[in-house]
């Protein structure tokens, strides 16, 4: 509210006129019902002091208006920032279609992320247990493969020339002892054969005879059958071991591929969990900062509103008193 120059100086320097007005027509502050509410203290306050107080209150009101304008600008900037965040979250999957983004949607999304993280951790624990069992099975398979390889080496050594095989067998004390026992038995058998041959020769039984030819033919047949049976047994065992080895190799390859796939899946799950944790932490920090900023702006606005209301009431009372004084002086 603006005042004229006459209203500001209350009649200029004419002290006599002021005194006449004060003694004649001006209403005294003593006539007020409550003297304690008199902001000027008493009726002896000079008009210049009142004018200074009015001017100071006007300056305070202007400062309050400036503060209010700055606070409103800050509020607008905060609203703009909030709108930016809302527009940033508008196209996110956790915001329902046709609705504006709200903090509860973000909180629900974060809670869902936490629950999914918990389920992923449980799946990771299950995968780790499966991995441990696969490692144990793989170790068992490796041990079986080592045993099969040793068996194959033994079979290969059995297929080597007789001299090398005999030399290797003689290095074993148990085999050497068995070989010595068999050698003694062979010598005894040779002695018995010689005695039998002597007896046959004594009864004129020779290989050229009919019985001798039949016996020799039967012996050759038995020897061939024994050799064939030995070859068949050796070949069947080798073939069986080769089949088992091929099956074991295929199983090991399958287990290895499954283990590699499981390991890749675990790495992907770990990366997803880490990214989810980072996103959740960043969003929580930003949300806390914005909440603090909004609370700070609200508190500032409340304080400014209270100050502006008090200042306006004081200025209105002073203006009314000034008008009444001016009217009474006139």
From Swiss-Prot:
Residues 17-26 have a biased composition (Polar residues). It comes from the Eukaryota. InterPro entries: WTAP. One of its GO terms (biological process) is mRNA modification. Disruption phenotype: Embryogenesis arrest at the midglobular stage. Its main location: nucleus. Residues 1-43 are annotated as: Disordered. Pfam families: Wtap. GO terms for cellular component: nuclear speck; nucleus; plasmodesma; RNA N6-methyladenosine methyltransferase complex. The modification N-acetylmethionine is found at residue 1. Residues 1-12 have a biased composition (Acidic residues). Ubiquitously expressed with higher levels in primary and lateral roots, leaves, trichomes, and in pollen grains (at protein level). The keyword Ion transport does not apply. Residues 56-308 form a coiled coil. Keywords: Acetylation, Coiled coil, mRNA processing, mRNA splicing, Nucleus. It is found in: Nucleus speckle; Nucleus, Nucleoplasm. Forms homodimers. Interacts with MTA/EMB1706. Interacts with FKBP12; interaction is inhibited by the immunosuppressive drug FK506. Interacts with VIR. Associates with MTA, MTB, VIR and HAKAI to form the m6A writer complex which is essential for adenosine methylation at specific mRNA sequences. Belongs to the fl(2)d family. Probable regulatory subunit of the N6-methyltransferase complex, a multiprotein complex that mediates N6-methyladenosine (m6A) methylation at the 5'-[AG]GAC-3' consensus sites of some mRNAs. Associates with MTA, MTB, VIR and HAKAI to form the m6A writer complex which is essential for adenosine methylation at specific mRNA sequences. N6-methyladenosine (m6A) plays a role in mRNA stability, processing, translation efficiency and editing. Essential protein required during endosperm development and embryogenesis. Involved in endoreduplication, especially in trichomes. This is FKBP12-interacting protein of 37 kDa.
